[in-house]
């Protein structure tokens, strides 16, 4: 039996050993096409936030009309959450060479300066401001104060700025430190309203009357992640388990046809900073 096996193994090993180096395989045209498409999407996204930025604040406008026709005269209205996505797009733009590192830094410095001086409510920014003044533009009658969800989207961007520039030159390190300070000033614990849940809104005029306790599952998970990880205004695990997860009730939602699912929108917003 052994005499039969050994010759067979020799034949197998000889067949597996290439007599010469295999020819290099050409790059997949599909992969090349995908890469080009990916770059195009990145560039167009960056261009929206760069060219379409409100000029005073540097932030993303709530609506950008390329023809400069604004029937509602809202060309200066900027958005906190959307601008957080824009901040990350600018970092991508720097990496891709769409703008220089210095150009990107200076634009981000303008944004950070606006965030430092614009209306803020217990560390949280409103959904909208007037970019020219930094004054809040009410999202609705009683929504004229802090918006902790939109603030969290902005913080995602600022934390990316911190990580990107923290080991750079003196100007970059200063920008990273300012971004870090803004994140540490958000009073997540205060937005509990004394309960084991986080509230979406607070108004200086109407207090907690919006009464929107945020529970999962939706696009707001990042707010709880940031609240739990805040080194200055953190919350306990009970806030997550009782508030977001509803003591297990979160497992009962979003199961059409018995399959756990949800809208991509709910996933996309809170994972903007993962990459």
Residue ranges and their predicted role:
Residues 16, 24-275:
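Ser/Thr/Asn(+Pro)-rich, low-complexity disordered segments
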Residues 1-26:
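Bacterial Sec-dependent N-terminal signal peptides
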């Amino acid at each position: 039996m052994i005499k039969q096996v050994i010759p067979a193994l020799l034949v197998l090993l000889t067949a597996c050993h290439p007599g010469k180096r295999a020819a290099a395989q050409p790059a997949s045209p599909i992969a090349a096409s995908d890469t080009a498409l990916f770059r195009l999407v990145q560039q167009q996204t960056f261009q929206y936030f760069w060219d379409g930025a409100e000029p005073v604040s540097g932030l993303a406008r709530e609506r950008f009309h390329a023809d400069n026709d604004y029937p509602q005269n809202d060309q200066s209205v900027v958005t906190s959450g959307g601008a957080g996505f824009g901040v990350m797009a600018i970092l991508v733009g720097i990496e891709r060479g769409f703008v220089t590192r210095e150009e990107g830094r200076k634009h981000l410095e303008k944004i950070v300066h606006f965030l430092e001086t614009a209306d803020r409510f217990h560390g949280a920014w409103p959904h909208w401001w007037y970019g020219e003044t930094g004054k809040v533009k009410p999202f609705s009658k009683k929504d004229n104060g802090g918006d902790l969800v939109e603030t969290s989207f902005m913080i995602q961007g600022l934390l990316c700025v911190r990580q990107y520039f923290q080991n750079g030159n003196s100007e970059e390190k200063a920008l990273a430190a300012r971004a870090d300070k803004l994140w540490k000033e958000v009073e997540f614990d205060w937005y509990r309203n004394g309960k084991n849940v986080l509230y979406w809104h607070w108004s200086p005029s109407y207090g907690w009357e919006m009464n929107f306790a945020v529970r999962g599952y939706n696009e707001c998970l990042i707010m709880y992640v940031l609240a739990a990880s805040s080194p200055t205004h953190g919350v306990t695990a009970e806030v997550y388990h009782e508030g977001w997860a509803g003591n297990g009730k979160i497992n009962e939602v979003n199961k059409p046809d018995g399959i756990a699912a949800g809208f991509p929108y709910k996933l996309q917003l809170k994972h903007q900073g993962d990459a």
